[in-house]
Amino acid sequence: MLRIQRVLLLCLTAAITGCTGLGRMQAPAISAEEYARHIATLSADEFEGRKPGTAGERKTVEYLVAEFKKLGLEPGNGDSFLQQVPIVEITAGSDARLQLGSAELKYMQDMVIWTKRLVPEISVADSPLVFVGHGVVAPELGWNDYAGVDMRGKTAVILINDPGFATDDPKLFRGRAMTYYGRWTYKFEEAARQGAAGAIIIHDEVPAAYPWDTVQNSWMGPQLDMVAADGNAGRPAIEGWITLPIAEQLLKASGHGYRELLLAASKPGFRAIDLKQKASGALRNAIRRSSSPNVMAMLPGSKYPNEYVVYMAHWDHLGRTLARSGDNIFNGAVDNATGTSGLLTIAQGFVAAKEKPERSVVFLALTCEECGLL
C-alpha cells in the first residue's frame, strides 16, 4: 500500500507542476497522510458505499463541499458547489422473467434483466436469438459483427471484452487491454443502434474481470439513468446478462460450443450466427424521477481566469447489496475513493503553492459513473 501511495503522490505532484502556466511552481504541500485520511473517510462504513440517491450520497457530497470550502476554493457552478444532474430511477420487479430456447431462467441466479425504457411494463416474445460475437462495429478497425444482419425484432447474444483479449494478440484491437468496444455500456449502445429488441451479454469472469455477484449487485434494485426526451424508446426492450453455464447450455442446444464461438468471434471476418432459438421475457418497473449532484469547486486563474483546466474523478460507488447479509457494504476504497481523494489532494497542492495558476482550475467530482452515465 505504501508503494502505491508513493506512486500516486508522484503523479499528483506531476499533475500540478506539469500544468500549462505552472512550470515555475514549487513542490506542493501534499502528504501521504492527508491522502490516506480522505480515502479512509470516504470508504468508511458510515458512507454506506456512496450510492447516488441514498444517505451515503448526502454524506459524501457534504464531505466534499466541506473539504473544498476548508481549502478556500470558490463554488464551481455560479454560487453553488453543486451541479444537479436530472436522473430517473427504474426498479425492476423481482418477478422479471426470461426464457432462452426451452430454458426458463431464474432471476439473479441465472440472469439479470432490466429495461432503460421508461415504461411500467415491457415484454419480448419469440425474439430470434442471434450470436453477434463481441457486438462490435468499428469501421476504423475494419470490424463489423453485425454485417449483413437485420436485428429488428431479434435478440443479440454478446461476448464481453474485445476480440484481442481472447486471442492475446496485441495487434488485434489492443490485445488484452480493453477498449471502449469491450465495455458492457458499448455493447448495449450498439445493440440499440442496430435496432435489436433484446441484448444479452454472456458473463465470463476472466474477460469481464469481476464475478457474477458483482453483476447481481449492480443490477439489483434501483437503476439510474439520464432523463431522455424520448423516454429511451430507442433502447432494446430488454437488456441483461446471463451466466456462463447458462450460455454454454444455450449454445450447446444450438449445436455450438462456447469456446468454439469465442475463438471464431475473435477472428477478422466473423459473421453473426442464427442460434435457431428464441427469447421471451417480461418485467415490470417502478419509475421515480430525481437528481444527483456533481460537486464542483474552482481556483480562479491569475492571468487567464476564463480559461480552465479541469480535474475529474467520480465520487459514487455501488452502495449496499441486498444479496448478502451481515457486512453488505461495498466500500469502494479503490473505486473510487482513491480518485476522489486524489482530487482533494491535488486541490490542496494548488492552494498551498506559492505561485498561483495562470488559468482557472476546476475540481469536478462526478456522480453516477457506476451506473454507466459517465
How should each PLM-predicted stretch be described?
Residues 40-43, 129-132, 155-159, 198-202, ...:
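Structural recognition of the beta-strand scaffold that forms the well-ordered cores
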Residues 176, 180-182, 207, 319, ...:
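Acidic/histidine-rich catalytic neighborhood of metal-dependent amide-processing enzymes
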